[in-house]
């Protein structure tokens, strides 16, 4: 429930920011059009005008306030996005990911332990993706919010799944946390994207959402 409310709040905030930005953009062009029209009519009709556009305090104040309002709107959106990105949503379950040289270990539901290694060349089947197939796949439920704790034991790794927009470093002695959520059933592939040794390119990640 909190995830849905947060999603709609961010969506509404983005819509408001876009509307405000468009309104300010439109107002600036309307003001520029009015000023250009006034100057053109004044020049054509030879009307003597004493307006001082160079040192007008009113115009300086107007543009300063307009710019500050625009910047404050952008800062408000940024602060809200940073705040909601750090909130611990109500998650279904916890999944721990530990990086080793050169394989992954997943801990699910507090008891299940999955060792995920690259399969041997002789075990490939027709249609398998080379260097992206594991002997054990991490199976999760779609439309369910998961909290992932990511760490490493020996060297720095990087848990990366481009399809989900996930890239988090696995640092020994440090636990990084990310939220994982998928809307469709799919099998997603990833790899370690941090140079972690000789077999760095042989640490595939496979997550199957059902």
Curated annotation (Swiss-Prot):
Keyword Transmembrane: yes
Catalyzed reactions per annotation: 4 Fe(II)-[cytochrome c] + O2 + 8 H(+)(in) = 4 Fe(III)-[cytochrome c] + 2 H2O + 4 H(+)(out)
Topology with respect to the bilayer: Multi-pass membrane protein
Keyword Chloroplast among UniProt keywords: no
UniProt KW keywords: Copper, Electron transport, Magnesium, Membrane, Metal-binding, Mitochondrion, Mitochondrion inner membrane, Respiratory chain, Translocase, Transmembrane, Transmembrane helix, Transport
GO MF, one example: cytochrome-c oxidase activity
Native species: Trypanosoma brucei brucei
Cofactors named for this entry: Cu cation
Transmembrane segments: 16-36, 64-84
Domain of life of the native organism: Eukaryota
Mitochondrial intermembrane face of the membrane: 1-15, 85-210
PANTHER family noted in UniProt: CYTOCHROME C OXIDASE SUBUNIT 2, CYTOCHROME C OXIDASE, SUBUNIT II
Locations listed in the record: Mitochondrion inner membrane
Name by which UniProt lists this protein: Cytochrome c oxidase subunit 2
Database matches in SUPFAM superfamilies: Cupredoxins (SSF49503)
Subunit structure, interactors included: Component of the cytochrome c oxidase (complex IV, CIV), a multisubunit enzyme composed of a catalytic core of 3 subunits and several supernumerary subunits. The complex exists as a monomer or a dimer and forms supercomplexes (SCs) in the inner mitochondrial membrane with ubiquinol-cytochrome c oxidoreductase (cytochrome b-c1 complex, complex III, CIII).
Role, per record: Component of the cytochrome c oxidase, the last enzyme in the mitochondrial electron transport chain which drives oxidative phosphorylation. The respiratory chain contains 3 multisubunit complexes succinate dehydrogenase (complex II, CII), ubiquinol-cytochrome c oxidoreductase (cytochrome b-c1 complex, complex III, CIII) and cytochrome c oxidase (complex IV, CIV), that cooperate to transfer electrons derived from NADH and succinate to molecular oxygen, creating an electrochemical gradient over the inner membrane that drives transmembrane transport and the ATP synthase.
Major place of residence: mitochondrion
């Amino acid at each position: 429930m909190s995830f849905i409310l947060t999603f709609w709040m961010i969506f509404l905030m983005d819509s408001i920011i876009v509307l405000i930005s468009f309104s300010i953009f439109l107002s600036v062009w309307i003001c520029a059009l009015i000023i250009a029209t006034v100057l053109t009519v004044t020049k054509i009709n030879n009307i003597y005008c004493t307006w001082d556009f160079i040192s007008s305090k009113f115009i300086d104040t107007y543009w300063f306030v307009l710019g500050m309002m625009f910047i404050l709107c952008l800062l408000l959106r940024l602060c809200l996005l940073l705040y909601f990105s750090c909130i611990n949503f109500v998650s279904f379950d916890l999944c721990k990911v530990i990086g080793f040289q050169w394989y992954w270990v997943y801990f699910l539901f507090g008891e299940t332990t999955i060792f995920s290694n690259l399969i041997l060349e002789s075990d490939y089947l027709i249609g398998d993706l080379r260097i992206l197939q594991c002997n054990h796949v991490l199976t999760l439920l779609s439309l369910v919010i998961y909290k992932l704790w990511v760490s490493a034991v020996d060297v720095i790794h990087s848990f990366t799944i481009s399809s989900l927009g996930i890239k988090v470093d696995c640092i020994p002695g440090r636990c990084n946390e990310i939220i994982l959520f998928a809307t469709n059933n799919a099998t997603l592939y990833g790899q370690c994207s941090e140079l972690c040794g000789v077999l760095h390119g042989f640490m595939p990640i496979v997550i199957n959402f059902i």
